[in-house]
Amino acid sequence: MSSPESSTESRLAALEARVTELEDLNAIRRLQWAYGYYIDYNRPEEVAGLFAKDGAVVFLSGEYVGYEGVMRLYGTWFQNLFTGGRRGPVHGLLLDHFQLQDVITIAPDGQTAKGRFRGILAGGWHDDILKDKPEGMPQQFWESGMYENDYVKEDDVWKIQRLDYMMQWQADYETGWSKTVAHLQPAAQCFPENPIGPDRILPDTQVRQTWPHRAEVPMSFAHPVLAHSFAVGDFTKLQKKWP
């Protein structure tokens, strides 16, 4: 029979572990939310500072690797397309990235984690700056995508290891998603041939087509009740009663 002291120590250790997990969840949530705010106002250096030393971003089926890759995407690609090379908010330009619906799973060792978030983007150019709108883009648009991200704790601070954004749909604000074909298409050429291209392109079997194409996004989390992680195409059998 265990002594009262050992029982108390066990309970305290269990409580400490639970508190640590809650703190980790909130730290990762705060990290991802901060990412959204920084890209809203075109702050690429701050965005890059959220990533681990060997961090990477997957965007439009291309992978941008390390600090140089992250800065090429957020500091060069986005600036060339949206802000004319300017840092910070631009008069008349709307690029709000909402980070929502998180499901975060901390690894047993507390050093890595996976997180699924939904992103919604409201974007567009006011009439005042319509001349700055890139050719081929709608003046006002919506976009939504899924993040399936990896996080790592470096020097006791949570950072983004791999941010994997999978676009789900785009919509011209005036005409709606039923009449929209995505103005962004999968990457076709790597850096340096394409000065704003990714460091590598995903294998053909992993390339993600954009709207109106639809595909299931792998889920990193276990079912809250059935305690099982479901792979793409892995559906629970129909049942006549609750399990």
Question: Model-found features: residue ranges?
Answer:
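A solvent-exposed, acidic/Ser-Thr-rich amphipathic alpha-helical stretch
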Residues: 44-124
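Short, aromatic-enriched amphipathic alpha-helices that serve as compact interaction elements
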Residues: 24-40
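Short, solvent-exposed loop/turn segments at secondary-structure junctions
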Residues: 122-126, 168-169
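Terminal "cap-and-tail" regions of soluble proteins that handle hydrophobic small molecules
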Residues: 2-25, 135-138, 154-243
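Transmembrane beta-barrel outer-membrane domains
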Residues: 26, 93-95, 140-142
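Outer-membrane beta-barrel translocator domains and adjoining extracellular loop/strand segments
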Residues: 128-130, 175-176
